C-alpha cells in the first residue's frame, strides 16, 4: 500500500465527511442554536420590559397607597372635627338644660318657701289670737274693758283676713 494513496483517501474521506456534515448536519444545528439565541434575546427583552412595567406598577401602587393614606387621614380628621363639634353642641345643650332645670327647681323652692312662710305667718297669727283671747279671758273681767277687747279682736280678725 502506498502511503500517499492512503493519506489521500483519508483526506478525501475527511473532506467528504466535513462536506456532508456542513451540508446536512450543520445547518439544523446552527438553526437550532440561532433559534435558541433569538428566544433567549426575546426572553431577556421581555424580562427587561416586565421589570420596567413592574417598576412603573410599583410606583403607581405606592402613589395609590399614599393617596389612600391621605384620604383616610383627611376622613379621620373630618370625623374628629365633627365629633368635637357634636360633643361641644351636646355639652352646650346639656348646660342650657341643666340651667333650665336649676331655674325651675329654684322657682319651685322659692314658691314652697313663700307658701311655708305664709302658712307659718298664718299659724303665728292664729296662735297669737288664741293666746291673746286666753290672756284676756283670764285677766279681764267680762264687763270691764269690753270695748277695748272688741276693738282688739276686730283688729286681729282683720289682720287674719288680710293674710
From Swiss-Prot:
Keywords tagged on the record: ATP synthesis, Cell membrane, CF(0), Hydrogen ion transport, Ion transport, Membrane, Transmembrane, Transmembrane helix, Transport
Native organism taxonomy: Bacteria, Pseudomonadati, Pseudomonadota, Gammaproteobacteria, Enterobacterales
Topology of the protein relative to the lipid bilayer: Single-pass membrane protein
Function, in words: F(1)F(0) ATP synthase produces ATP from ADP in the presence of a proton or sodium gradient. F-type ATPases consist of two structural domains, F(1) containing the extramembraneous catalytic core and F(0) containing the membrane proton channel, linked together by a central stalk and a peripheral stalk. During catalysis, ATP synthesis in the catalytic domain of F(1) is coupled via a rotary mechanism of the central stalk subunits to proton translocation.
Similarity field: Belongs to the ATPase B chain family.
Native organism: Buchnera aphidicola subsp. Schizaphis graminum (strain Sg)
Main location: membrane
Annotated CDD domains: ATP-synt_Fo_b (cd06503)
Name of the featured protein: ATP synthase subunit b
Subcellular location: Cell membrane
Keyword Secreted annotated: no
Gene Ontology MF terms: proton-transporting ATP synthase activity, rotational mechanism; proton-transporting ATPase activity, rotational mechanism
Known partners and oligomeric status: F-type ATPases have 2 components, F(1) - the catalytic core - and F(0) - the membrane proton channel. F(1) has five subunits: alpha(3), beta(3), gamma(1), delta(1), epsilon(1). F(0) has three main subunits: a(1), b(2) and c(10-14). The alpha and beta chains form an alternating ring which encloses part of the gamma chain. F(1) is attached to F(0) by a central stalk formed by the gamma and epsilon chains, while a peripheral stalk is formed by the delta and b chains.
Presence of the UniProt keyword Ion transport in the record: yes
GO cellular component, one term: proton-transporting ATP synthase complex
Chain's gene name: atpF
Segments traversing the membrane: 13-33
